[in-house]
């Protein structure tokens, strides 16, 4: 009997040990369960934060790419239209050359002077053409408010809204208008 009591005691101790281990395991599982839920919540928060930062990064990258393209275009435009201001100033000189040629053509005196003025005028026009300045064709063309500046209207036998006289030539550099042509338009 002693042995059975001793065995019984050992069994009880083992049971108590198992019970305490079981309780500790249950407590650990419950605490881990709470921690697991916390970890899942933190993971979801970090994932949302990452997606937000990644989205901001993509927008910033697109903005930078657009900025680089815009700067390259502006640099190209600077080179294309660098002569625009000086060409605009030279247009008044061209107008004066044209007036001088017209006034000397009426008088037959100073034929050599007329030739000299004509040569300088042609050279100036050639230089401007070489740098992209072109005359706007206006005579007998349909009136275009982007290219022409109508200062007069006159009854005409032809179609209406056509340029019938050019009072001052217009010029453009590449695709930009330096000065619109001042014209008379048919009614």
From Swiss-Prot:
Question: Does the keyword Chaperone feature in the UniProt annotation?
Answer: yes
Q: Does the keyword Cytoplasm apply?
A: yes
Give the subcellular location: Cytoplasm
Give the compositionally biased regions (Basic and acidic residues): 1-15
Q: Residues annotated as region Disordered?
A: 1-40
One of the Pfam families matching this protein, by short name:
GrpE
GO BP terms:
protein folding
Alphabetically sorted, this entry's keywords are: Chaperone, Cytoplasm, Stress response
Q: Which InterPro entries match?
A: GrpE (IPR000740), GrpE_coiled_coil (IPR013805), GrpE_head (IPR009012)
Q: Which GO terms describe its molecular function?
A: adenyl-nucleotide exchange factor activity; protein homodimerization activity; protein-folding chaperone binding; unfolded protein binding
| GO CC annotations on file | cytoplasm
> Can you tell me which family this protein belongs to?
Belongs to the GrpE family.
The record's subunit annotation is: Homodimer.
Chain's role: Participates actively in the response to hyperosmotic and heat shock by preventing the aggregation of stress-denatured proteins, in association with DnaK and GrpE. It is the nucleotide exchange factor for DnaK and may function as a thermosensor. Unfolded proteins bind initially to DnaJ; upon interaction with the DnaJ-bound protein, DnaK hydrolyzes its bound ATP, resulting in the formation of a stable complex. GrpE releases ADP from DnaK; ATP binding to DnaK triggers the release of the substrate protein, thus completing the reaction cycle.
Protein name as catalogued:
Protein GrpE
Q: Which organism is it from?
A: Alkaliphilus oremlandii (strain OhILAs) (Clostridium oremlandii (strain OhILAs))
């Amino acid at each position: 009997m002693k042995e059975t009591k001793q065995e019984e005691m050992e069994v009880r101790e083992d049971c108590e040990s198992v019970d305490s281990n079981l309780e500790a395991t249950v407590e650990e599982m419950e605490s881990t369960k709470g921690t697991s839920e916390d970890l899942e919540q933190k993971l979801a928060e970090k994932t949302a934060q990452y997606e937000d930062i990644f989205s901001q990064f993509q927008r910033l990258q697109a903005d930078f790419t657009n900025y680089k393209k815009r700067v390259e275009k502006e640099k190209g435009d600077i080179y294309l239209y660098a002569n625009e201001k000086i060409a605009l100033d030279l247009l008044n000189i061209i107008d004066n050359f044209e007036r001088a040629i017209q006034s000397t053509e009426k008088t037959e005196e100073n034929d050599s002077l007329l030739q000299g003025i004509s040569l300088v005028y042609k050279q100036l026009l050639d230089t401007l053409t070489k740098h992209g300045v072109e005359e706007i064709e206006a005579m007998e063309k349909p009136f275009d408010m982007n290219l022409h500046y109508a200062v007069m209207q006159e009854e005409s036998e032809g179609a209406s809204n056509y340029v019938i006289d050019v009072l001052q030539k217009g010029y453009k550099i590449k695709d930009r208008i330096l000065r619109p042509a001042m014209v008379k338009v048919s009614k």
